[in-house]
Design a protein with these regions (language model features):
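NAD(P)H dinucleotide-binding glycine-rich loop of Rossmann-like/cofactor-binding domains
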Residues: 88-166
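C-terminal hydrophobic helical "lid"/dimerization subdomain
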Residues: 195, 287-339
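Mid-domain Rossmann-like dinucleotide-binding core that forms the NAD(H)/NADP(H) cofactor-binding site
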Residues: 134-213
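Short Gly/Pro-enriched turn/cap motifs at secondary-structure boundaries
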Residues: 7, 18-19, 51-57, 108-112, ...
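Glycine-rich cofactor phosphate-binding loops and adjacent beta1-alpha1 units
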Residues: 155, 182, 199-271
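Glycine-rich beta-strand-centered segment in the early N-terminal region that forms part
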Residues: 20-34, 47-92, 131-133
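C-terminal substrate-binding/catalytic core of Rossmann-like NAD(P)-dependent dehydrogenases/reductases
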Residues: 256-307, 318
């Protein structure tokens, strides 16, 4: 099969390799679509991953091609998404069903081979069955959609809350859509620094503030930080109202220093500051993922307009480079496989 194999930092090769093995309890998926996550870019170009060689790609959808156990044969031919985290099932969070906080997890696309390939292996438990009316490109966005949902649940958004999300990536924009759904108000804002993102954000029904041209108000009940930079965290603590909640979701690109003034703001405003990580998943039981599938099916969360670029499997290098070089605005960059 064809795959993008990372052999070392900044050494990604498009090459022929064997289709992965399919042990008992696992499935082989024929990949149909795989989104490029912002975390894939440092993994490929600057920081590397846990071992080499590795195939990146953890946001994907496909069709079940084969299974390792006869008991799972009903999955063959089904359209699926996939929860990429493989829990150890031995640690305390796993025993409580909080698999997203597993202490010893495996992960498709970073700790084991992922979906920038024609085929990918995954445990059957991790498969999310899809209604066939959901396009594969939309289903490949279930992972960031569920992550955005999880952040809004951590925030505890109530009806009527005024909410800001700092960050114009797909997860930030979908978090704002979830916030709008839960607050039942149009008082939901995405804060960015690029005027070209306005049309993408406002196309989902959420308001946009270009921080370079407009100072945000300081009366938000909830602020979700979806960048991971010191300046955006500082903004979050500035614009949340006294007694409000700040949720930290953005992956940090380096150390996040905490100034004395910032610390005072947390104390004097009596803020709740929470972290969020990944998304809840429970197989076929209710979770962030089942809720995300429902939202795609009923159209209550809009994702089509967030796909700003598509590349065929043979041209995916262009997608990786586009995101790495930041020469043009983008939201979700999608790669298409086995079309």
């Amino acid at each position: 099969m064809k795959a993008y194999v990372l052999h070392a930092v900044n050494d990604l090769r498009y090459e022929d390799i064997d289709i992965p093995a399919c042990p008992e309890g696992w499935a082989i998926l024929k990949v149909k679509a795989a989104g490029i996550c912002s975390s894939d870019i440092p993994r490929i170009f600057t920081k590397g991953t846990y071992h080499f060689p590795t195939i990146p790609g953890h946001e994907f959808s496909g069709i079940v091609d084969s299974v390792g156990s006869a008991a799972d044969s009903s999955w063959v031919g089904k359209h699926v998404g996939c929860f990429p985290l493989i829990p150890c099932r031995k640690c305390e969070p796993c025993s409580e069903g909080h698999y997203e906080m597993c202490a010893h997890y495996d992960y498709i696309g970073s700790r084991r081979d992922g979906a920038f390939a024609e085929y990918v292996a995954a445990p059957v438990w991790n498969l999310v069955e899809l209604p066939e009316n959901i396009p594969f490109e939309h289903a490949a966005m279930l992972e960031p959609l569920a992550v955005g949902l999880h952040s809004t649940k951590i925030a505890g958004i109530s009806k009527g809350d005024k909410v800001a999300v700092i960050g114009t990536g797909m997860i930030g924009i979908t978090a704002a859509q979830w916030a709008r759904k839960f607050s039942c108000t149009d008082d939901i804002y995405v804060i960015g620094r690029n005027e070209e993102k306005r049309i993408i954000v406002e196309g989902t029904g959420v308001r946009y503030i270009n921080q370079k041209e407009e100072k945000p108000a300081d009366d938000f009940n909830v602020v979700i930080e979806a960048v991971g930079s010191p300046s955006s965290i500082d903004t979050a603590l500035n614009i949340v109202k006294p007694g409000g909640t700040v949720v930290l979701m953005g992956n940090p690109s380096g150390d996040i220093p905490l100034s004395q003034n910032t610390y005072w703001r947390i104390l004097r405003k009596q803020l709740t500051v929470r972290g969020t990580w990944n998304s809840s998943y429970a197989g076929r039981d209710a979770s962030d993922w089942t809720e995300a599938v429902k939202a795609l099916k009923d159209g209550s969360i809009k994702v089509a307009s967030l796909i700003t670029h598509k590349f065929s499997k043979d041209d995916a290098f262009a997608g990786f480079n586009l995101m790495h070089e930041h020469k043009q605005p983008y939201c979700k960059v999608m790669t298409i496989w086995n079309s």
